[in-house]
Amino acid sequence: MLVLYGHSTQDLPETNARVVGGTEAGRNSWPSQISLQYRSGGSRYHTCGGTLIRQNWVMTAAHCVDYQKTFRVVAGDHNLSQNDGTEQYVSVQKIVVHPYWNSDNVAAGYDIALLRLAQSVTLNSYVQLGVLPQEGAILANNSPCYITGWGKTKTNGQLAQTLQQAYLPSVDYAICSSSSYWGSTVKNTMVCAGGDGVRSGCQGDSGGPLHCLVNGKYSVHGVTSFVSSRGCNVSRKPTVFTQVSAYISWINNVIASN
């Protein structure tokens, strides 16, 4: 599920971002990370990441659920290709996409969706809720953040089997929206991180979390949204995330009314 925008010679957003230049995460060191999988034939396939935000709600990217598929969420996973013994499998009962999301215009923003699970997961040391930032919270430039996911480990590469993490310091809006970076493609409802040309998200990381260290604890400040169509790890084209703090009231309203 690779969504391409325009030609590869232009710096246009490409959704489905995966971790490039990362390392294998410690087993269950990011216990709010989930794998969003769809059924095709008799098999299940990882398509996106997500964050467990309630025992029966997951936050992901809207572009991950643009297609009518039968989805399930796997919590507590580390190696997608084997049984770790810690996984919890739950079907997705309802999908709520942000009403302003337009799949033909990723750069407009609103790339966020909430998934209500058919039943609540059990919280333990392998499965925990992600901590969300306060509404309107803005990261300082160069804040320490990690992207996590099972996405491709290089442009046009293979999906990772074990959860990967990469250190991606945040890039503030003033820099990220400058002409030598993303320009007007990036909006102030987005978070940019990385851009060193080595480490980035890539296809398959989409929808997953950007964990940032603020006041001594990690919270999920981003939902992985897009990278450059020229490649995942392009210098001065940081990975772009939906800014979670811009959607806190929407998230709370959706959960309260569903």
From Swiss-Prot:
Entry protein name: Chymotrypsin-like elastase family member 1
Job of this protein: Serine proteases that hydrolyze many proteins in addition to elastin.
Propeptide: 9-18
Keyword Zinc-finger: no
Keywords: Calcium, Disulfide bond, Glycoprotein, Hydrolase, Metal-binding, Protease, Secreted, Serine protease, Signal, Zymogen
Annotated source species: Homo sapiens
Organism superkingdom: Eukaryota
One GO MF term attached to the UniProt entry: metal ion binding
Active site: 63 (charge relay system), 111 (charge relay system), 206 (charge relay system)
Enzyme Commission number(s) from the entry: 3.4.21.36
